[in-house]
């Protein structure tokens, strides 16, 4: 097997089948790999990461590996470090929220954030929504905070700000008002929820791309 088709260690090389080796050593920049549970997705992803670096196709800080849980992210880092004799601290390996948080802390000015912005957990976010609703004299028996919270998070995850949401009925209009009030208070306090991390990171990247073209 040639250098271009080799992996970082014989142990990992022997643990991959032909299809997995093909996925790890693809020359294409983009590829969609479909695989079921327990099929070795993490092994392939981390081996691909290591292969790109070992063959000097990419630098450690230019490769992004994203997963859904902190446990999976830690496992990826351990597997990569087992194949590469380098410091993993500068690598972009983590969860969606974790990586967005790290990116925004690095580019807080471009993202219109204070340098030391804070992240609200689910309980804090719900409390913040309740405060906004109380200030607006919204009866929670008629419009539960849980429903409003779902509305806000869903729109943020779809990339929609309060000003962009089109409301056609009284309930939707009230939810939009609460969403807007929540945005204003969070911005003033220098805090944001988990969905805000994703949305603000997306907006910053789009804005940066538009400026560079």
Language-model region placement:
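Conserved lysine of the Walker
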Residues: 41-42
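A basic/glycine-biased coupling hinge at the interface between accessory DNA-binding modules
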Residues: 2-11, 28-31, 36, 50-213
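Post-Walker A alpha-helix
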Residues: 45-46
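Pre-Walker A adenine-sensing motif
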Residues: 14-25
């Amino acid at each position: 097997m040639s250098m271009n088709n080799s992996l970082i260690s014989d142990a990992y090389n022997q643990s991959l089948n032909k299809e997995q080796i093909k996925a790890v050593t693809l020359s294409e920049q983009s590829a969609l790999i479909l695989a079921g549970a327990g099929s070795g997705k993490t092994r392939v992803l981390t081996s691909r990461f290591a292969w790109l670096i070992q063959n000097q196709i990419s630098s450690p800080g230019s490769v992004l590996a994203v997963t859904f849980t902190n446990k999976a992210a830690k496992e990826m880092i351990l597997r990569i470090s087992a194949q590469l004799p380098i410091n993993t601290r500068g690598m972009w390996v983590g969860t969606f929220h974790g990586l967005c948080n790290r990116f925004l802390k690095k580019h807080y000015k471009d993202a219109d954030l204070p340098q030391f912005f804070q992240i609200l957990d689910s309980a804090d976010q719900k409390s913040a929504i309740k405060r906004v609703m109380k200030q607006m004299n919204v009866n929670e028996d008629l419009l539960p905070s849980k429903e409003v919270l779902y509305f806000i998070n869903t729109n943020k995850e779809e990339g929609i700000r309060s000003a962009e949401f089109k409301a056609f009925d009284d309930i939707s209009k009230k939810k939009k008002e609460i969403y807007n009030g929540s945005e204003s208070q969070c911005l003033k306090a220098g805090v944001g929820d988990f969905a805000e991390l994703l949305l603000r990171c997306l907006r910053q990247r789009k804005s940066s791309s538009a400026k560079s073209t």
